[in-house]
């Protein structure tokens, strides 16, 4: 989650990133300032930053997989710590749609939607960690990045 913000800041500074796999990235998703600010059902202004369109466009050239585990609400629960993740998942989906609209290749996976239940914020410590690694490996293979 903490690595997400570092990734979003690094992409505009280099052309050496071949792909991004982000497990429950936290704050700082970059949105283009030539579009309206993203709005979710969850109040969280830390989840995104507005950037110039030419900065945002760099993300369209990098295949990206974003994965979120279980226990993330789809509507506000009144618990700010839990709701924060609902907003982040919604922001990731909005971000993916905007990047893809500009020619990008972003996939957002919410594991329960694929039938995986019980995954925490630390998928490589979960009992199905081999399945999680396989999910990531298969995506890398589909993108020709498994060499």
Where would I find each of the regions flagged by the language model?
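Catalytic active-site module of serine/aspartate enzymes centered on a nucleophile-bearing elbow/loop
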Residues: 118, 122-147
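Short glycine-enriched nucleophile-adjacent loop
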Residues: 4-15
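Residues at the C-termini of beta-strands that transition into short coil/loop
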Residues: 24, 68, 112
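Alpha/beta-hydrolase fold nucleophile elbow
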Residues: 1
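Short glycine-rich catalytic loops that host catalytic nucleophiles or stabilize transition states
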Residues: 109-118
């Amino acid at each position: 989650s903490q690595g997400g913000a570092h990734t979003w800041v690094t992409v505009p500074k280099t052309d050496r990133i071949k792909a991004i796999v982000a497990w429950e990235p936290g704050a700082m998703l970059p949105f283009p300032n030539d579009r309206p600010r993203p709005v979710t059902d969850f109040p969280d202004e830390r989840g995104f930053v507005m950037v110039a369109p030419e900065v945002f466009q760099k993300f369209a050239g990098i295949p990206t997989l974003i994965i979120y585990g279980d226990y993330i609400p789809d509507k506000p629960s009144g618990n700010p710590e839990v709701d924060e993740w609902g907003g982040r998942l919604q922001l990731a989906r909005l971000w993916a749609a905007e990047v893809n609209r500009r020619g990008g290749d972003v996939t957002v996976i919410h594991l329960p939607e694929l039938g995986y239940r019980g995954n925490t914020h630390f998928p490589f410590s979960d009992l199905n960690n081999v399945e999680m690694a396989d999910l990531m490996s298969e995506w890398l293979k589909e993108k020709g990045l498994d060499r």
